[in-house]
A protein has these predicted regions:
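Gram-positive cell-envelope targeting signals
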Residues: 194, 248-249
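An alpha-helical repeat/solenoid feature that recognizes helix-turn-helix modules
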Residues: 1-13, 29-63, 68, 75-113, ...
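Alpha-helical scaffold repeats of the Armadillo/HEAT/TPR superfamily
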Residues: 18-21, 58-61, 65-66, 111-115, ...
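A conserved helix-loop-strand patch within extracytoplasmic ligand-binding domains
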Residues: 20-30
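Terminal, non-catalytic domain-edge segments
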Residues: 169, 183-241
């Protein structure tokens, strides 16, 4: 949903599938944990989508329910985690990104304030973060996304340790070919997260909307394809090689 919205496509009609429909089932979407609820809310809010009506017998989800679920999972130290009693920087960052647009609610505003304080305390002396005993670029990326979502400068003193910002630390993970590493070698997931974080930072510097607010994405104007049959026809129309044994890719 996030990817489709970013390129101007409609997630309510993808080859006949309504991808938003799955987000209407509160029990199913919250069962995996707090990060699942966070990304459901990010997906709904990225295009300001309405939550579809869920199937009979299932619990109808609302934005308020997702917000309350995340608030209820906040730890006593101010952060969030999965299966732990102490805050994890990645999980805390993801939840704060989702809660950022709801700070007109006093309870949310207070929770966000505590979460930001905890993220600041979790930062290492070199500007980075440690999650589950490992330092990685992904943790830095999530915090950069969070600061941008909350309108906090990369140079905010709360997130600069010994002259090193979290953005400074993130850039140390970039390899010579432009990709990013998880710890010391190329990692696709790390690269994807780093690009999202850097895009968010660029958007913030340019005064644009937050990264996950995609209502300014240019909408595609082509007529939607209906169902699998239309796509099958497209595949069948592709040129075929009678003998591919010697064909170079």
């Amino acid at each position: 949903i996030l990817g489709l919205t970013a390129i101007g496509e409609d997630p309510a009609n993808v080859a006949g599938y309504h991808l938003l429909a799955a987000l209407s089932d509160y029990d199913a979407t919250t069962q995996p944990g707090v990060t699942s609820a966070a990304y459901v809310l990010l997906a709904l809010d990225c295009g300001n989508y309405e939550i579809p009506k869920t199937e009979a017998g299932k619990t109808q989800a609302t934005r308020e329910m997702y917000v309350d679920f995340m608030l209820g999972k906040q730890l006593s130290d101010g952060g969030w985690a999965i299966g732990a009693e102490e805050a994890d920087p990645d999980v805390t960052a993801m939840v704060l990104q989702a809660l950022a647009p709801y700070q007109s609610n006093t309870a949310v505003k207070n929770a966000v304030s505590l979460g930001v304080q905890r993220l600041s305390k979790l930062q290492n002396d070199d500007g980075g973060y440690t999650s589950w005993g490992y330092t990685s670029s992904e943790s830095c990326s999530q915090v950069v996304l969070t600061l941008c979502a909350l309108g906090i400068s990369m140079d905010d003193s709360r997130f600069v340790k010994n002259g090193h910002s979290v953005l400074d630390k993130l850039l140390t993970y970039q390899l010579s070919d432009g990709s990013f590493c998880h710890e010391d070698s190329y990692d696709a997931y790390a690269t994807m997260q780093a690009l999202c974080a850097l895009s968010a930072a660029v958007r913030q510097q340019a005064g644009k909307r937050a990264f996950f607010t995609m209502t300014d994405a240019a909408k595609q104007t082509h007529a939607p394809q209906s169902g699998v049959a239309a796509h099958t026809a497209q595949v069948e129309a592709l040129p075929a090689f009678s003998d591919i044994s010697g064909h170079a890719n």
